[in-house]
């Protein structure tokens, strides 16, 4: 058993496969995800886990060099993202999901609580 950090094996594997500039997303429970994109579904019930809980667990595990959020994203979601942010329409964000390596589905019920992250490098 792992001693610390992420425990979900699918999530650990997906993160380990990321390369520089690969994109991935953290999404609310209602975001339509393209069929061909891997979904790592962490949602248990509405509101659990929250976007913030998932993002806080991910931050020590990944290197991020940029992010994309939709125009309607709440300010609290923007404040959680510790990198340069590009703001696009919600439709453009949904279109960009098609290029993501995977999407992490949370139990978040806040509208537009969706962020696409661009992987950086640790060196």
UniProtKB/Swiss-Prot annotation:
Subunit structure: Homodecamer.
Binding residue positions for substrate: 28, 90, 112-114
Organism annotation: Corynebacterium glutamicum (strain ATCC 13032 / DSM 20300 / JCM 1318 / BCRC 11384 / CCUG 27702 / LMG 3730 / NBRC 12168 / NCIMB 10025 / NRRL B-2784 / 534)
Reaction equation(s) it catalyzes: beta-D-ribopyranose = beta-D-ribofuranose
Function text: Catalyzes the interconversion of beta-pyran and beta-furan forms of D-ribose.
Database matches in SUPFAM superfamilies: RbsD-like (SSF102546)
GO cellular component terms listed in the entry, alphabetical order: cytosol
Biological processes, Gene Ontology terms: D-ribose catabolic process
Swiss-Prot/TrEMBL keywords: Carbohydrate metabolism, Cytoplasm, Isomerase
Keyword Lyase: no
Pfam families (UniProt xref): RbsD_FucU
Active site: 20 (proton donor)
Subcellular location: Cytoplasm
The keyword Cytoplasm appears for this protein: yes
Signal peptide start-end: none
Main location group: cytoplasm
Gene behind this protein: rbsD
Family of the protein in this entry: Belongs to the RbsD / FucU family. RbsD subfamily.
Metabolic or biological pathway: Carbohydrate metabolism; D-ribose degradation; D-ribose 5-phosphate from beta-D-ribopyranose: step 1/2
The protein's Enzyme Commission number: 5.4.99.62
Name under which the protein is recorded: D-ribose pyranase
GO MF, one example: intramolecular lyase activity
